[in-house]
Amino acid sequence: FLPIIGKLLSGLL
């Protein structure tokens, strides 16, 4: 996954 996607996932969690 891209760093941006990972960052979004972390924000959701």
UniProtKB/Swiss-Prot annotation:
Keywords: Amidation, Antibiotic, Antimicrobial, Chemotaxis, Fungicide, G-protein coupled receptor impairing toxin, Mast cell degranulation, Secreted, Toxin. It is found in: Secreted. GO terms for molecular function: toxin activity. Expressed by the venom gland. GO terms for biological process: chemotaxis; defense response to bacterium; defense response to fungus; killing of cells of another organism. The modification Leucine amide is found at L13. One of its GO terms (cellular component) is extracellular region. Coiled coil: none annotated. The keyword Secreted applies. Belongs to the MCD family. Crabrolin subfamily. The primary structure of this mature peptide is identical to that of Vespid chemotactic peptide 5h from Vespa magnifica (AC A0SPI1) and Vespid chemotactic peptide VT1 from Vespa tropica (AC P0DRA0). Antimicrobial peptide with activities against Gram-negative bacteria, Gram-positive bacteria and the fungi C.albicans and C.parapsilosis. Exhibits little hemolytic activity against washed human erythrocytes. Mast cell degranulating peptide. Induces the chemotaxis of neutrophils. Its mast cell degranulation activity may be related to the activation of G-protein coupled receptors in mast cells as well as interaction with other proteins located in cell endosomal membranes in the mast cells. This is Vespid chemotactic peptide M. It comes from Vespa mandarinia (Asian giant hornet).
